[in-house]
Amino acid sequence: MKIKSSLKSLKKRDLNSKLVRRRGRVYIINKTNPKFKARQK
């Protein structure tokens, strides 16, 4: 999982990426290609 201060560019990397908020943190999840997971710092 990548940890970045800005997730906008990471969201554009794949069409299936979704932005999710969990416990006050922002995540990018991707069911079809899990290598695109990311969390905002």
UniProtKB/Swiss-Prot annotation:
One of its GO terms (molecular function) is structural constituent of ribosome. Belongs to the bacterial ribosomal protein bL36 family. One of its GO terms (cellular component) is ribosome. It comes from the Bacteria. This is Large ribosomal subunit protein bL36. InterPro entries: Ribosomal_bL36, Ribosomal_bL36_sp, Ribosomal_L36_bact. The gene is rpmJ. The keyword Ribonucleoprotein applies. GO terms for biological process: translation. The lineage of its organism: Bacteria, Pseudomonadati, Pseudomonadota, Alphaproteobacteria, Candidatus Pelagibacterales. HAMAP family: Ribosomal_bL36. Keywords: Ribonucleoprotein, Ribosomal protein. The keyword Ribonucleoprotein applies.
